[in-house]
């Protein structure tokens, strides 16, 4: 089996641009280069037409009206615009916000900033499987709660929250509901109407589109109001000023159009790859899958291998592009805050690999990855005195380690 290395298995960090998407983008860099806001000549009209076509394709994937799509630079900006924008607009009604401890940093750090500005935030914990307890959410809601922000698919462990049930709770209590769907679009069916979502963040580069472009869905009926965070020429109905990057928008539109069309075949492909990988690592002892396997994005596996250091494992499998945690925070050697929230101890949180498959991943690559990981785990454990003690039946928790 000859597999070209390194094998890319980090599709939750970013995806390659689909060739069909790249082809669609190129003319808008050189020939059709007009500014979509130039409404006095054909160059501008052609560009605007392309932007509106993309807007419609993005809206179609999430069952929205094209008028509800606001272009941004990515999901981080969309999260900021949604959360700060709604919090500041509705602050006369109350200053209490609710989110979850396992959210992406783009949501958590935005919430922290609002706390500095005098808002109060409740951070909900999750159960061992990574899902929130809906009763706990209901209990956290107060009369002055104005916004709830909960991600659809977790970027580290891939668990899928029960978004329609949460949407129902928010609508009943007349609270604005924001969902970070950066990892959900193209992996699970997304329907803003059925799930009663008010604000939804999207990114192109997680869906085989270009980096640097995203969108925010802003509900019109019942209307959700936001305070703009970026001021200027009043583009995007005043929500987000700045010249629209036609080529990137066209890329995002085409990527989302393909994602809608090929969702079923992509899903089947991911599940097949996941099964091959899980079968391939069968027989390794002390392996823990992090997060619920039922309620999960089909392309995500987050696995902890006990008695192996995550960093040394990543070095050992340098033929694979995998990560320990999210790309945004993998530079820090802190154990993953998401895994800690599941109740995993530091050792297990440190020994995890996030393996995420994509449209371009082949069965041979996954087979190769599983076999490589299996052999390296064996070698690394042979070097571990703790593994030896564990195999000898010694309860490691009962040992008192001497301080040097």
Swiss-Prot record:
Gene Ontology biological process terms from the UniProt entry: [2Fe-2S] cluster assembly
Subcellular location: Cytoplasm
Biochemical pathway: Cofactor biosynthesis; iron-sulfur cluster biosynthesis
Keywords: 2Fe-2S, Cytoplasm, Iron, Iron-sulfur, Metal-binding, Pyridoxal phosphate, Transferase
GO CC term, one of those recorded: L-cysteine desulfurase complex
InterPro entries with a match to the protein in the record: Aminotrans_V_dom, Aminotrans_V_PyrdxlP_BS, Cys_deSase_IscS, Cysteine_dSase, PyrdxlP-dep_Trfase, PyrdxlP-dep_Trfase_major, PyrdxlP-dep_Trfase_small
Residues the record lists as N6-(pyridoxal phosphate)lysine modifications: 206
An MF annotation (GO) of this entry: metal ion binding
Quaternary structure, from the entry: Homodimer. Forms a heterotetramer with IscU, interacts with other sulfur acceptors.
Sequence similarity: Belongs to the class-V pyridoxal-phosphate-dependent aminotransferase family. NifS/IscS subfamily.
Protein name as catalogued: Cysteine desulfurase IscS
Organism: Neisseria gonorrhoeae (strain ATCC 700825 / FA 1090)
């Amino acid at each position: 089996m000859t597999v070209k290395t390194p094998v890319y298995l980090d599709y939750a960090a970013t995806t390659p641009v689909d060739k069909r998407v790249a082809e669609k983008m190129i003319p808008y860099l050189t020939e059709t280069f007009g500014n979509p806001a130039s409404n006095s000549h054909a160059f501008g009209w052609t560009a605007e037409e392309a932007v509106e076509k993309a807007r419609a394709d993005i809206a179609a994937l999430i069952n929205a009206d094209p008028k509800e799509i606001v272009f941004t630079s990515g999901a981080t900006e969309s999260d900021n615009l949604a959360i700060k924008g709604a919090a500041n607009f509705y602050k006369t009604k109350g200053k209490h916000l609710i989110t979850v401890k396992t959210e992406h940093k783009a949501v958590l750090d935005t919430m922290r900033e609002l706390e500095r500005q005098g808002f109060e935030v409740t951070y909900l914990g999750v159960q061992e499987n990574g899902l929130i307890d809906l009763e706990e959410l209901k209990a956290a809601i107060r009369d002055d709660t104005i916004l709830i922000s909960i991600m659809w698919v977790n970027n580290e462990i891939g668990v899928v929250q029960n978004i329609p049930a949460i949407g129902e709770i928010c609508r009943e209590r007349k609270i604005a509901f924001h969902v970070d769907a950066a990892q959900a679009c193209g992996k699970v069916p997304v329907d803003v109407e059925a799930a009663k979502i008010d604000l939804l963040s999207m990114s192109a580069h997680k869906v085989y589109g270009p980096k640097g472009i995203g969108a925010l869905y802003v509900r019109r009926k019942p209307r959700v109001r936001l305070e703009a965070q970026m001021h200027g020429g009043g583009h995007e109905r005043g929500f987000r000023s700045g010249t629209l990057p036609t080529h990137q928008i066209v890329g995002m539109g085409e990527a989302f159009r393909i994602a809608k069309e090929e969702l079923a075949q992509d899903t089947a492909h991911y599940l097949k790859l996941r099964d091959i990988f899980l079968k391939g690592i069968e027989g390794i002892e002390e392996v823990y899958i992090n997060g619920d396997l039922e309620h999960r994005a089909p392309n995500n596996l987050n696995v902890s291998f006990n008695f192996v250091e995550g960093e040394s494992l990543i070095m050992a499998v340098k033929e694979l592009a995998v990560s320990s945690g999210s790309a945004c925070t993998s530079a820090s050697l802190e154990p993953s805050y998401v895994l800690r929230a599941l109740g995993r101890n530091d050792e297990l949180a440190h020994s995890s690999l996030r393996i995420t498959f994509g449209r371009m991943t082949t069965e041979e690559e996954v087979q190769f990855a599983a076999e490589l990981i299996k052999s390296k785990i064996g070698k690394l454990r042979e070097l571990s005195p703790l593994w030896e003690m564990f195999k000898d039946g010694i309860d490691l928790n009962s040992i008192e380690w001497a301080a040097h």
